[in-house]
Amino acid sequence: MAQFTGRVVGDYLVGRQIGSGSFSVVWEARHRVDGTEVAIKEIAMDRLNKKLQESLMSEIFILRRINHPNIIRLIDMIKSPGKVHLVLEYCKGGDLSVYVQRHGIVPEATAKHFMQQLAAGLQVLRDNNIIHRDLKPQNLLLSTNENDADLKIADFGFARSLQPRGLAETLCGSPLYMAPEIMQLQKYDAKADLWSVGAILFQLVTGRTPFTGNSQIQLLQNIIRSTELHFPGDCRDLSLDCIDLCQKLLRRNPVERLTFEEFFNHPFLSDRQSYDFSRSRLGLRTMDGFLSSGSSPSRNMEESSQEDCLPFLLDDDSSGPEGSPSYLKKTSSMKSSSGIKVDTRIERKEVESSPLKHTELTSGYSSFNQKVENDRFRFETQINSDRRNRREPTGLTDSRSLIAPGRVDDSQDSMDQDFVLVSGPPVDMPSSSSSSSKPYNFPFKSQSPPVELFNRSISSTAPMPIIGATSNSIGQFGSLDSQYSAPSTSHGSLDLGDAFEQPSTHSLTRIRSLRKYAATIAELVYERIESDKHLEAFSIQLAILAIWKQALHICHTQAISGLEGSPSQDINKLRSSSLKHDTHSSNKVTDLSHDGSEEISSQIQRQFIQEIELAEELAKSIEPGNTKMPDAMETIFEAALDLGKLGGVKEVMGDTENAGNQYSKAVRLLVFLLVEAPMLILNPPLSLTNSVRYRLRTYIDFLSRRLKHLQSHRRSSAGQMQGSSLAMMNRQS
């Protein structure tokens, strides 16, 4: 070891610097008692934004519980003012890229040895719901310099997020191993890792990468133009199994690419030793409300279709994540003290690319954009076991469930995410399976025609009729504003009265709901404006205009036809309640005309005009040449999943207040998609299939139960605190 520098971090003596990045420095170190050599990554937390800090801590929370010989071990985390030190396993052999530079073309037997170890590590990650989105030789470390060294997967999100991405590194590093669907900013899933594995194997046995280019654009063009994988003429001695594996991993269309199960069982890796699943899983303790983390990794198709239930990728760039990104559930595979399970398997032809209509479901997320952000974490509920107990069918019309695809918000974000935490993916289907053609897969295949989650058929754009199931009286509500609370203020204010799949027949109740939907969706617009995603913001803003237009239509229809029998009665109740609860509110209904709707209509008109002005401003910022308008409904759906994911992260981290806020907004968006969106004046109109409705109801039910759990927990905690205070007062007296 290099000369001791005199620095001490925890129980470790710090030696020479062995690496550095924009926000981190890596040091060689030695335990001062037993002499164990380690690598210490020193991260300057004050240089990370809040999202990166959360993603980093979330990833650490997960990775500390993975113990496998083919994954770099996180030994300890040491905090100091302004810094976090990650104590990592030290690998004397350096990384695989150095090995390749030193040896050139490696014997097939050696390549097989490394591939078997890489496969074992990937299987562990997959069983723990982790997608490593930056597999390349530089991120594969070797325990020694020998040909039989242990290979260890490293840099789970930290390196990508913390290191500068200069042009040279961008062109010479990740893109050479990056799946084409990622470079094209399409939806992608764990199969992107398999492309990277194929590129690494190809380089090991041929001495060069499968595709090259003078720029990333040219590299992508070369991949797209290729019709088959070409091996150099001096590689005639490669076995058929090796060639077959390379060809099947490097399929441009991820739908045609091998599934993970097919990869793990490929003849080229057939003599790989199996590992103990129980040891590789996250050692997360079970908490009430969460599925156990030790669930079996193998699931049949029926179970898988149901377990797809909460595709929250804690990936945040989302986003994830994820994380990110990402966490646990007592009733799920991962757990939190509240009840969210994070399933254990990742792959998916599903999460892959999810182009709904014109847009793809996006991250990130990345979930945790960074790691856990990057980690897209999907929370799976107890619904599967509950259904089995009730003997309800577990299969859906289309076996694939809505899997939140790893969102690729922008190229830099997508590159900054190293792995995604997702809830257990559906059982792998052979690459030749016809299942990919099923009509409403949430997971969209990146190379195949877009598969729509929401069926958008062009038809008349006339105002939708005001129909709906019977609802409770609106007398409990004040004015449109007096009882309204911003979506982020309290998770106890969520109104689920419209969750019967049909809008309320009470005009004021429905208008109030529309207003809350618009306010929540408006947050998405401003988030995208801040991220310079003006086209996406404009698309969502048009949906908000449709909401307010529907509200105006309700007012006009009520005034003309008295649809609810006695409209003035509801209006008067509203006015009475408003005067009682908020006599000083500038927004209350103070002067109603004979039909009672004039003032409310005026308020809505003013809001509608404001939204039009914002839409006009957004339209000015859209660059010419943008021919495809993102699908606002898909964007809203993705946002709901991201919010649910973030709520799960907050819940696991013990921040129940914010968890409830995120759950509340997620439910509101999902209820909007289920109840109101199909009724809006959209072109083309939104049409939901029964299977999509079922999924939306499932998500709403799950998140609503999480909300109820948090509220119950808070009431219980408050009661205990009050009891303790009374007991203390009694003792003092």
Swiss-Prot record:
Residues 329-339, 566-577, 717-733 have a biased composition (Polar residues). ATP binds at I18, G19, S20, G21, S22, F23, S24, V25, V26, K41. A motif (AIM (Atg8-family-interacting motif)) lies at residues 419-422. PROSITE patterns: PROTEIN_KINASE_ATP, PROTEIN_KINASE_DOM, PROTEIN_KINASE_ST. GO terms for biological process: autophagy; protein transport; regulation of autophagy. The active site is at D134 (proton acceptor). Signal peptide: none annotated. The keyword rRNA-binding does not apply. One of its GO terms (molecular function) is protein serine/threonine kinase activity. GO terms for cellular component: autophagosome; cytoplasmic vesicle. Keywords: ATP-binding, Autophagy, Cytoplasmic vesicle, Kinase, Nucleotide-binding, Protein transport, Serine/threonine-protein kinase, Transferase, Transport. The keyword Kinase applies. Residues 342-360, 379-393, 579-596 have a biased composition (Basic and acidic residues). Residues 292-363, 379-414, 565-596, 713-733 are annotated as: Disordered. Its EC number is 2.7.11.-. It comes from the Eukaryota. Serine/threonine protein kinase involved in autophagy. The ATG1-ATG13 protein kinase complex regulates downstream events required for autophagosome enclosure and/or vacuolar delivery. PANTHER family: SERINE/THREONINE-PROTEIN KINASE UNC-51-RELATED (PTHR24348), SERINE_THREONINE-PROTEIN KINASE ATG1C (PTHR24348:SF68). This is Serine/threonine-protein kinase ATG1c. It comes from Arabidopsis thaliana. The lineage of its organism: Eukaryota, Viridiplantae, Streptophyta, Embryophyta, Tracheophyta.
